[in-house]
Amino acid sequence: MAIVKVTDSDFDSKIESGVKLVDFWATWCGPCKMIAPVLEELAGDYDGKADILKLDVDENPSTAAKYEVMSIPTLIVFKDGEPVDKVVGFQPKENLAEVLDKHL
């Protein structure tokens, strides 16, 4: 599955079931650009097991504030609508896969 962009208005409905890795990012963020290809690979690797979502914090500040996102990129794993794990900053694919695997 491709990465899905989410907004403040549809965020809750997109995370309500299953395992989701949400990338809180911004267009001007260098590390966010570095992690983008890693997330594309994960989206392919975890197709059918977990979804990768992206939320632009500049365009959607309410959701970022709700989950206390202070630095970007912040990646939060949600399981059935609840946050279960959080990683801040660039991470290699192996680290993110390990985080996701804990919640599948």
UniProtKB/Swiss-Prot annotation:
SUPFAM superfamilies for this protein: Thioredoxin-like
Gene Ontology biological process: cell redox homeostasis
Domain spans labelled Thioredoxin: 2-104
Keywords for this protein: Disulfide bond, Electron transport, Redox-active center, Transport
Pfam families membership: Thioredoxin
UniProt-listed InterPro entries: Thioredoxin, Thioredoxin-like_sf, Thioredoxin_CS, Thioredoxin_domain
Cysteines paired by S-S bonds: C29-C32
The UniProt record lists the keyword Transport: yes
Gene Ontology terms, MF aspect: protein-disulfide reductase activity
GO cellular component assignments: cytosol
Superkingdom of origin: Bacteria
Matches recorded under PANTHER family: GEO12009P1
Function, in words: Component of the thioredoxin-thioredoxin reductase system. Participates in various redox reactions through the reversible oxidation of its active center dithiol to a disulfide and catalyzes dithiol-disulfide exchange reactions.
Similarity-based family: Belongs to the thioredoxin family.
Protein name in UniProt: Thioredoxin
Organism name: Staphylococcus epidermidis (strain ATCC 35984 / DSM 28319 / BCRC 17069 / CCUG 31568 / BM 3577 / RP62A)
